[in-house]
UniProtKB/Swiss-Prot annotation:
Its EC number is 1.-.-.-. This is Quinone oxidoreductase-like protein 1. GO terms for molecular function: oxidoreductase activity. The keyword Magnesium does not apply. It is found in: Early endosome. Component of the FERRY complex (Five-subunit Endosomal Rab5 and RNA/ribosome intermediary). The FERRY complex directly interacts with mRNAs and RAB5A, and functions as a RAB5A effector involved in the localization and the distribution of specific mRNAs most likely by mediating their endosomal transport. The complex recruits mRNAs and ribosomes to early endosomes through direct mRNA-interaction. Keywords: Endosome, NADP, Oxidoreductase. InterPro entries: ADH-like_N, CRYZL1, GroES-like_sf, NAD(P)-bd_dom_sf, PKS_ER. Component of the FERRY complex composed of five subunits, TBCK, PPP1R21, FERRY3, CRYZL1 and GATD1 with a ratio of 1:2:1:2:4, respectively. The keyword Mitochondrion does not apply. It comes from Bos taurus (Bovine). The gene is CRYZL1.
Length: 349
């Protein structure tokens, strides 16, 4: 039985992906479930977070968003039985890679998969669904009538975010990074209030948002990264398409929420003062927090169930690439790790 792992070189950030033979899984006991994996979605690995949590080891398992069939359950398992169809996210410290035929996982990381939902849809939506719920419900309190700016709305995460915001009755503004993205966003139903094309570098996001909201500013911003410095000082890998932090602060309305994915965000005293005057809040989107405390377990499972329900009723319509076989996972994962893919990649077994 082969599984995909990654190895990080000691000198630099470069990581290599390798297939390794695995021993058969031990007997399933206590609260653990043995799962036959039917699909596993690929996401970028945050090596920095793993290092900070002292979770580095020579070979680290790859693939966490899994959907599959329960083969066997431990004696204390109460939620599942053999032949149940389930979906979930393996914890950061999982010893088993999701990119493998079978995995062992604690029952508290899984929920039932609705019959209508395909394996690839389930695995491909569960993590982005969780991130969007975290951003729009728990960090910014989305409600009907609010205005929401979703940066890079044509990305896998952005698409789900727009769909949830529309479902909740919010007014959505989004940015497009290319002509294809712009055309994709303009075809959205219900329609997006305004699509701002930032691909040519001429559009002013802040001006467009203030114009669209009658000068009031938006209630919620979900960014896809921001520039912290002027264009001359910014490192080359930071896309010039990203907005500057001052633009985001300018377009925020009174009492607004800025949910950021920029883990190294730095705010100077004038920035903080401007946020203070608006009574606005900055929140950091880190979906790993749900499993860092057992107190959150019930809420976490409710979110996963709700994501699957939204998928089965057609509220969520994910942007998935064509499913690929396991033997192509190594090459595809290298592309995903460099953040070069637009649609969500799913390995189908």
């Amino acid at each position: 039985m082969k599984g995909l792992y990654f190895q990080q070189s000691s000198t630099n950030e470069e990581i290599t992906f390798v297939f390794q033979e695995r021993e058969n899984l031990p007997v399933t006991e206590d609260n653990y479930v043995k799962l036959q994996v039917k699909a596993c979605a690929l996401s970028q690995i945050n090596t920095k977070l793993l290092a900070e949590m002292k979770m580095e080891k020579e070979f680290f398992p790859v693939g966490r968003e899994v959907a599959g069939i329960v083969l066997d359950v431990g004696s204390k398992v109460s939620f599942f039985q053999p032949d149940d169809e389930v979906v979930g996210i393996l914890p950061l410290d999982s010893e088993d890679p999701g990119l493998c035929e079978a995995v062992r996982v604690h029952e508290h990381y899984l929920v039932h998969k609705p019959e209508k939902v395909t394996w690839t849809e389930a695995a491909g939506t569960i993590r982005d669904g969780l991130r969007v719920y975290t951003a729009l419900h728990y960090l910014s309190h989305l409600s009907p009538g609010k205005s929401v700016l979703i940066m890079d709305g044509a990305s896998a995460l952005g698409t789900i975010a727009i769909q949830l915001a529309h479902h909740r009755g919010a007014k959505v503004i989004s940015t497009a990074c290319s002509l294809e993205d712009k055309q994709f966003l303009e075809r959205f139903r219900p329609p997006i209030a305004r699509v701002i094309d930032v691909s040519n570098g001429k559009a002013h996001v802040a001006e467009s948002c203030l114009e669209e909201t009658g000068g009031l500013g938006v209630d919620i911003v979900l960014d896809a990264g921001v520039r912290l410095y002027s264009k001359d000082d910014e490192p080359a890998e930071k896309l010039q398409l990203l907005p500057h932090k001052h633009d985001i602060i300018t377009l925020l309305g009174v009492g607004g929420h800025w949910v950021t994915t920029e883990e190294n965000l730095q705010l100077d005293p004038p920035d903080s003062h401007c946020l203070f005057l608006k009574g606005a809040a900055v929140a950091f989107l880190n979906d790993e927090v749900w499993n860092l405390s057992n107190v959150q377990q019930g809420k976490y499972l409710c979110i996963l169930k709700d994501v699957m329900e939204k998928l089965s009723t057609g509220v969520f319509r994910p942007q998935l690439d064509e499913p690929i076989p396991l033997y192509e996972a190594k090459v595809t994962m290298e592309v995903v790790q460099k953040n070069q893919g637009r649609k969500k990649q799913v390995v189908q077994f």
